[in-house]
Structure formats: structure tokens, C-alpha cells
Amino acid sequence: MKRVDAHGLKIAPVLFDFIAKEAAPKTGIAPDAFWAGVAAIIKDLGPKNRALLALRDALQAKIDDWHRANKGKAFDLNAYTAFLKEIGYLVPEPATQKVETANVDEEIGKICGPQLVVPLTNARYALNAANARWGSLYDAFYGTDAIPHDPSESGKGYNKARGDKVIAKAKAFLDAAVPLATGSHTDVTAYSIVAGQLAVKLKSGNATALKNAAQFAGFQGDAAAPSAVLLVNNGLHVEVTINRNSAIGKDDPAGVADMVMEAAVSTILDMEDSVAAVDAEDKVLVYRNTLGLMNGTLSADFEKGGKTLTRSLNADRSYKTPDGKGEVKLHGRSLLLMRNCGHHMFTDAVLDERGEEVPEGLLDAAVSGLLAIHDLKGNSKVKNSRTGSAYIVKPKMHGPDEVSFTCEIFDRVEKMLGLPENTLKVGIMDEERRTTVNLKACIQRASKRIMFINTGFLDRTGDEIHTSMEAGPMIRKNEMKAQAWIKAYEDWNVDMGLIDGLPGHAQIGKGMWAAPDKMADMLAQKLAHPQAGATTAWVPSPTAATLHALHYHQVNVIARQEELTKGGPRAKLSDILTIPVSKSNWAPDDVKQEIDNNCQGILGYVVRWIDQGVGCSKVPDIHDVGLMEDRATLRISSQHLANWLHQGVITEAQVMESLKRMAVVVDKQNAGDAIYKPMAPAFDGVAFKAACDLIFKGREQPNGYTEYILTARRREAKAAG
């Protein structure tokens, strides 16, 4: 490949052309000026980036030495804490200072609700996520196990018995969230608007109204016979769709055909853990899809029922005000946030003046800023931010100095692009241990830019294992969620967010529900996230977003945060620093089960990543339950096995035997995939080798990250065709 030279950089032609012909036009930024700015940022900040990574390695080496020096002794938490302070891992906690982030959209500062994460390599998925601001509650109940499946309800076509259960459950939700003054929504025969109020007729013949008249927010159609009634609860809207001629509405006493929930309030467009972007072509695909979302032109064709359909961004939703005289406009799409790569990644899409790969996070920030201009300047028929902000999630930062570095990058990008100061907002992923223990300082370093903090249990566990690799054998993977450090970590995140005044300025978020087919379990368990004071939490699909929205109707998060603030902080640093090592002597069958579970999960994810470039997918686990896997789950599994190997719990021979046995299982699970390349019986493919590397070289991977091995092996697979 002949690269394009510009300002000392050597740029892949596909990226150079994308910036010149697609990204830069209509932004007011000349392509040459863009590359001049990028070159200056890389020259000035590249060395600082490398120095921060070197500090990570130096701190890890000191921690490893400390554990080795104290091997065989009872763990002394006070001595350990003092040591972490001495080496600069644990910094002094700053005085409380409230954040000052300005110009954030309501979806960040005011509205509480679900958050989707979507890989930017797939345009249709990205559009589905952006459009998941609204979702059918009837469809979500009908198509999932949120209502248990009765064998008698199976078959093609609509099953009325199941449909009746769906309608009953949906109306029970409405009774709880938007109750009537008397009676139930189940007994309604007509909704109408009289004198700016919702008038409700019951089958008894009696008239009633909403218990709280302010929950009526608008309508569509005629006041006497509306086609939609808009209700609101805890800041989230519900549209009751009325159509007496529809298949569902014709049998409903009030003609109700559906309930459309305001669902995915925000969506993370992912350039990081859920994508396999290893070269310039991959990066341009990610950037091009982002551009299409920022300028409103993205579309995707797909086949359904023998027809070709085109998906594009939904328009805003329009209703009449309750008095019928004005208009209520509601956002038709999720607020879009862009997740860039972390400081540790490098890309060959651009080489610096020494011919070395440049920090990928620097390139991502510059391109993200450029693409956001299309939204900020109004180049799109639909708006993302209404307040002049662009939202960038920054993952895998270790401690406050790295947060400061991110803010410095954003400052340079704003100056380069002529954007007002603090246009680029930052989401801090609290997924590395050094960020957790110094979270207050991290928040304050970004006090004018911060737009969210979010716990990421999966990556955080991977870092927990790697940081304390020398401390001893870790407990079994499935026991990790029950440990004291996990509860403290989750509570600490909310505590610090409330202390630093994030409400009104930034989201406080919780992690992913990883089982997209287990919606009944999600409904039972994920209520805990808003109850914990989180304003948002991650879901794996638009349907899951629709169902998780129910939890924000059950819990008034703003009121819950006020309760928690009055109660004071709940988490203790001492619990967070308690290392999850085990003194157990596990039975041989338990050890074998742990190895098999980890090996199967690693192979199931890695084989698609390496051979097909799929960075996030629903991978069947060892029990054939589909789980959403990305690099975070891979990090835990590979680090867990690396720890047990290093601590002598298991042998390389045991792991290799399991890998080969589990490869056969994974091959069978993928038998229906026409482009799948089996790993057995040769076990010599690039994907199988990558899985081996992740385990057997896991201890030497910086912070236990999987990206370096995955990227190298994916490039190898692409080169081999």
C-alpha cells in the first residue's frame, strides 16, 4: 500500500480519501488543515501517551514485587494500602467540588432510562439502536420470555391467548405507572380529550380521569377520538396507540392497538470493545457509519418476507398539546454517544514521522470531533444534540492523570476544529481498578466535561485479576459477583457521583445485561440498577431497552438519589481493596468445569473475531445459553486461566486438552454458519492459536488486555485471505 504523505504523517489512502471526500466537506474544515492539526496533536501528545502506558507497566511491576515479597504471609490490608499510596497508585482524595458540565442534553442531565451499546461496524444494528428511543411494549412482551411461553401458544401467526396475556400485563403496567382516579385501564372503553384533560370512559358506564392529570402530555388525531394518547411518568413517555381497525385494536374495548415506550434514551456508538477494527479499511467503515448517523444519511437495506426494506433514522415524534392548540415534539432517536479507543491502542491507519503506528485514541478523538460538526452545524435533517455538545465515551483509563490527558486531547481537538471550549464531553468508564480507587479525583479532573460515569463489571474484574496476579489463585469466575469488592465498587461509583454533583450534569450508569434471551430474569434483576441510584444502565438490544424502561417507571431515580445523598456514602475503600483470592482446594471436577467453561467461552468468541471480524455477538455458552460477548468477557476468562496457571492450580496440558475438546463443541454450535471455519481436528488455525496466546501469554499482556493478540492475529487471518 502506497501511503499519502501529509505533514509528516503517512496516511492509508482509504482514510485520506474518506476525510477529503466524505467527512470534511460541509464542516468548514479543509482536509489539509485537519491533517496538519492531527500531525501536531500526535507529535505533541504521542510521547505523553506512551509515558502514561509506561507508568501503568511500572506500577504493575511494583505491585507484583510487593505480592511476591509478602507471599506466605497473612494479607495486611493496612500495609497494602500504605504501599499503594507510596508508589502513587492511590492518590490523595481531593476536597469535594461539584462538577460544572454545561450544555448537556436532557438525555444526559435529566431523563433516566436505558442505554444501548452498538458496534459501529454494522450499519443496520446502529440504525436499530438509534431508532430504539421508542419500542413496542406489546411486541417486547409477546416475543420474549417476559411472559412465560406456553407450548400451546407456539406456531406461526398471532396467538390470541398469548396476546391476551400481553395486553393484560401491559395494562397492569399502565395502572401502576399512570393510574386512573378510579378503575383500571383494563376496563376502559374510550379515551378522549375534553377541555385539555384526558377523559376516560369505563365499561361500567362511569367516567373517570387520570389520578394525576399532569401525566397527560398530548395526543394525536381528533380530541373526541384520538389515534394516540401521550402519557408521562418519571420523565419517560408512553404512547397509547388507538386503532379500532387494527388486528389488535379491533378486539380491545378502548381500541388500544399498542403501547409504545420511550426506551433507549441514549446509545453508545462503539468504536472499541464490540468491534474488530484492525486496519484502515475497518476504521473507515466505523467512521463512515458514524458520519451517516451524524449527518442523517445512513441507511441499510435488508430482506424481510421476500422484500427488500430500507432502514434509516426515524424522524421526531409530533403530538398536539393537551389543549389541542400547540405542538409537542419529542426526540425520535436515542441520543448518540461515541466510544473511542483507549489510550493503550495503536493503529496503522496512520504512521507518524518515525514510521510507527499512532495512538488510536488520538485519531479517534480528532475524527469524532470532525464528524460531530455535521450535527453541530445542522447538516442533518435530524438533530442529535440540541445543546451544541458532542459526547465521547473514553474507556480503560487508569487514574486521574489519564483523565487529565483525555481532557487535554479534547482541548486540542476543539482548538484544531474551531469548536467552543468544552464542546466535547467525556464519559468516564469506571472499569479499571486505579480509576475506581481514585474516582473522586478522576471526576474532578474532568469537572467541566464529564457527562457520565459508568461501572463496567466485566472489564473491572479482568483488571482486578491481572493487578493481583501474584497475590494467589483467584476464586471461581461465577463467584466473583458475590464478593465484597464488587458491591463496594458499584456503590462507590454512585456515592462519588452524588458527592460530586453529577445529577443534572451527567449520567451515573450501570453495566450490561448479557443474556438477551433471558428477559424474565432481566425484569426480575435489573430493577436493582435504578434502585441503586443509577440514571442509566446497559442493555443488549432494542427489545431489552423497551423492557428495562419499565424499571424507570417503577423507580423515581431522582428521588432515590436524594434519599441516597441524605443517607451518606455506603462503600468503603477497604472493601474495594480486598483481593478476591481463594484458599480453597477445589475438587478435580470443579477445576475441570472451570477450565472448560472458560475455554469454551474464549473459543466461541475468538473464532468469530479472528475469522469473521465480528467483535460482538451472541455466543452460546457451555450450556447453549446465548450470551452477548465482547472483549471484556474475553479479558476475564483469559486472565482467570492465566492466574490459575501461574498459581499452579492447573497445568498447560489440562488447558490444552480442554481447548481441543471445547473446539469440537464450538464447531458444533456454529454448524449452521456457512462461512464458519472449523477449528477441529487440526487445531492449527489462526483463531485457535489466538485463543492459546490469550491464555498462555495472558500474564504478560499489559493490564490483561486482549486487544494486542486479537489485532495481530486478525491481521494475520486477513492477510491469509
From Swiss-Prot:
Its cofactor is Mg(2+). It catalyses: glyoxylate + acetyl-CoA + H2O = (S)-malate + CoA + H(+). Pathway: Carbohydrate metabolism; glyoxylate cycle; (S)-malate from isocitrate: step 2/2. Involved in the glycolate utilization. Catalyzes the condensation and subsequent hydrolysis of acetyl-coenzyme A (acetyl-CoA) and glyoxylate to form malate and CoA. It comes from the Bacteria. Belongs to the malate synthase family. GlcB subfamily. Mg(2+) binds at E431, D459. Glyoxylate binds at R339, E431, G456, F457, L458, D459. One of its GO terms (biological process) is tricarboxylic acid cycle. The active site is at R339 (proton acceptor), D630 (proton donor). The modification Cysteine sulfenic acid (-SOH) is found at C616. It is found in: Cytoplasm. Monomer. It is an enzyme of class 2 (transferase). The gene is glcB. This is Malate synthase G. Its EC number is 2.3.3.9. Keywords: Cytoplasm, Glyoxylate bypass, Magnesium, Metal-binding, Oxidation, Transferase, Tricarboxylic acid cycle. GO terms for cellular component: cytosol. One of its GO terms (molecular function) is magnesium ion binding. Transmembrane segments: none annotated. Acetyl-CoA binds at V117, R124, Y125, S274, R311, P540.
